[in-house]
Design a protein with these regions (language model features):
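Conserved GNAT-fold acetyl-CoA-binding loop/helix
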Residues: 46-67
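A short helix-loop-beta-strand connector motif used in the catalytic cores of GNAT acetyltransferases and
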Residues: 68-81
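Short, P/G- and charge-enriched loop/turn segments at secondary-structure junctions
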Residues: 14-16, 67-70
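Acyl-donor (CoA/ACP) binding surface of acyl/acetyltransferases
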Residues: 1-45, 79-203
Length: 203
């Protein structure tokens, strides 16, 4: 699989998040015109929460779009929408947040619309995001927490090369119940053949 990346201003992602491209996908920061596609995506029953504690609506997603830009400028994290095809259809959302002040460790969430699961979109997206995190951001470790019952997502992370580190018992509240989550990790030194060059490291 051939993957190319375009990273304008990648040396300072806090000032401007670059656009990353691969054969199937283009990743860019959310903008106001993404409102309705994101409302639909985040309203899915199995959607990642991305910080939402209540059912999403237009107002909450508008606030989310503004908040992710603020989080990026302060260095707390960054968010990409995943688009695909000639029409640049919004088909997913990826967010990476720092878990320590120096961003040595980050946590990511990725959500794809059902029609794009199992198509290769996730693996291309993950390779771009992982390479950006380890290269431009300079992180050493990337974690992911996935509901144990989500076999497809856990299988995709395993295929990516992530290591399962344990089960977080009843650690996620969804609706009226608490779910177990699988803790996965990716390390910079293990990224190896998945690497996609996205520019120089941020110091």
């Amino acid at each position: 699989m051939s993957i190319n990346s375009s990273a304008v201003g990648v040396s300072d992602w806090r000032a401007e998040l670059p656009t990353l491209t691969a054969g199937l996908v283009v990743l860019r920061e959310p903008i106001s015109k993404d409102l309705q596609p994101l409302v639909e995506l985040l309203s899915l029953a199995d959607a990642c929460r991305f910080g939402f504690d209540e059912p999403v609506n237009d107002v909450l997603v508008e606030q989310f779009i503004a908040r992710v830009r603020q989080d990026r400028t302060t260095g707390l994290g960054f968010t990409f929408v995943v688009t695909t095809g000639p029409a640049a259809t919004v088909c997913g959302l990826v967010q990476v947040r720092q878990l320590d002040p120096s961003f040595e460790t980050g946590e990511w969430e990725c959500m794809l619309a059902p029609a794009f699961r199992g198509t290769g979109v996730f693996l291309e997206t993950a390779r771009l995001v992982g390479s950006f995190v380890f290269d431009a951001v300079g992180a050493h470790r990337l974690e992911s927490r996935v509901p144990l019952q989500n076999g497809r997502a856990n299988g995709a992370l395993r295929k990516l090369g992530a290591v399962q580190e344990g089960i977080l018992r009843r650690s996620l509240r969804r609706g009226g119940e608490y779910l177990d989550q699988v803790l996965w990790s990716l390390l910079k030194e293990d990224w190896g053949p998945r690497w996609v060059s996205t520019g120089s490291r941020v110091h």
